[in-house]
């Protein structure tokens, strides 16, 4: 009888232990499944929100070719801004080259002459035969551009086609067309007007060496959102003229966010090379901030 009571007690204790373990495991699973959201998630950003000044001690580079070791952005740097030097960030799944310039920050050239810039120059295609080209690709984010309140002096360039020509006229290293971002303002939710998107314009020459209002024309291309990742492609080169056998066209074809914006350069017979620069250039009021990632470059030369 005593043995039966002992066995019965033992069975009851085992059942109780198993039930308690099962409940504990179920509670643990419920606790693991509970996800507590972050009440104040912080968005990834590499935007400069500090004060806008001409120069900083850290940004005052001694030479135009000041660069970081092994930059991820391709091309030879031309840094003519004492506000900030080229640097890089790692956000949004990419490594980004940071290009920040401010009004009045060109410490390399004579005062009140050339505009601030941090650009990268790519080796030029020096041939003019059909099939010669220079092609640049990258991903761009625009965070801020210069603004004076007047269209002609507002906006900042993020890319340009370059190329010398015969017969003289204009700069010794003339731009062919420049891609300019203009600010579009909207409410930030707190009653402040801030730059929320950007109109992209192509500033193109009317003739070789053209500059100023008489020598260039602005053509609206499209609008992009602030901080939007935009696939960019620019190809500058020579191709056969379908309407004039034996002659070639000099062209600058851009693709911005999947949309094509092709353009034939005036006086193609005078062109002798095709080149590209990108980064940040021109700010006549405030600050400009561009970010570049996944940059690549190819060229071909056909005589």
Swiss-Prot record:
One of its GO terms (cellular component) is plasma membrane. This is Ulvan lyase NLR48. Changing residue 216 to M: Abolishes catalytic activity. It is a lipid-anchor. Residues 41-74 are annotated as: Disordered. Changing residue 117 to N: Abolishes catalytic activity. Its EC number is 4.2.2.-. It comes from Nonlabens ulvanivorans. Ca(2+) binds at residues 59, 61, 79, 81, 84-85. Ulvan lyase involved in ulvan degradation. Ulvan is the main polysaccharide component of the Ulvales (green seaweed) cell wall. It is composed of disaccharide building blocks comprising 3-sulfated rhamnose (Rha3S) linked to D-glucuronic acid (GlcA), L-iduronic acid (IduA), or D-xylose (Xyl). Ulvan lyase catalyzes the endolytic cleavage of the glycosidic bond between Rha3S and the uronic acids GlcA or IduA, producing oligosaccharides that have unsaturated 4-deoxy-L-threo-hex-4-enopyranosiduronic acid (deltaUA) at the non-reducing end. Pfam families: PL28. The active site is at 162 (proton acceptor), 281 (proton donor/acceptor). Keywords: Cell membrane, Disulfide bond, Lipoprotein, Lyase, Membrane, Metal-binding, Palmitate, Signal. A lipid is attached at residue 23 (N-palmitoyl cysteine). A lipid is attached at residue 23 (S-diacylglycerol cysteine). Substrate binds at residues 157, 211-216, 281-284. It is an enzyme of class 4 (lyase). Its cofactor is Ca(2+). Residues 1-22 form the signal peptide. Belongs to the polysaccharide lyase 28 family. It comes from the Bacteria. It is found in: Cell membrane. GO terms for molecular function: lyase activity; metal ion binding. Changing residue 162 to M: Abolishes catalytic activity.
């Amino acid at each position: 009888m005593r043995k039966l009571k002992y066995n019965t007690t033992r069975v009851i204790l085992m059942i109780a232990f198993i039930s308690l373990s099962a409940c504990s495991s179920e509670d643990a699973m419920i606790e693991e499944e509970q996800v507590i959201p972050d009440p104040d998630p912080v968005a990834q950003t590499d935007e400069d929100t500090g004060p806008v000044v001409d120069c900083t001690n850290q940004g005052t580079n001694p030479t135009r070719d000041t660069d970081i070791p092994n930059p991820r952005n391709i091309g030879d740097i031309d840094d003519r801004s004492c506000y900030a030097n080229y640097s890089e960030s790692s956000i949004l799944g990419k490594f980004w080259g940071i290009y920040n310039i401010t009004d009045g920050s060109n410490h390399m050239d004579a005062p009140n002459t050339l505009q601030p810039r941090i650009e990268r120059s790519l080796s030029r295609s020096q041939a003019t035969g059909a099939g010669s080209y220079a092609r640049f690709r990258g991903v761009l984010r625009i965070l801020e551009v210069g603004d004076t309140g007047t269209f002609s002096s507002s906006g900042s360039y993020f890319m340009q086609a370059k190329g010398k020509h015969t017969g003289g006229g204009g700069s010794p290293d003339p731009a062919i067309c420049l891609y300019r971002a203009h600010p579009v303002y909207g409410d930030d939710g707190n009653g402040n007007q801030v730059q929320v998107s950007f109109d992209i314009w192509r500033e193109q020459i009317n003739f070789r060496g053209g500059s100023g209002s008489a020598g260039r024309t602005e053509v609206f291309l499209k609008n992009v959102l602030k901080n939007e990742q935009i696939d960019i492609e620019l190809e500058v080169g020579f191709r056969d003229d379908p309407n004039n056998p034996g002659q070639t066209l000099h062209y600058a074809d851009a693709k911005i966010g999947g949309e094509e914006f092709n353009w034939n350069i005036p006086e193609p017979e005078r062109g002798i090379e095709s080149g590209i620069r990108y980064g940040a250039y021109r700010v006549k009021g405030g600050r400009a901030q561009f970010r570049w990632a996944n940059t690549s470059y190819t060229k071909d030369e056909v005589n």
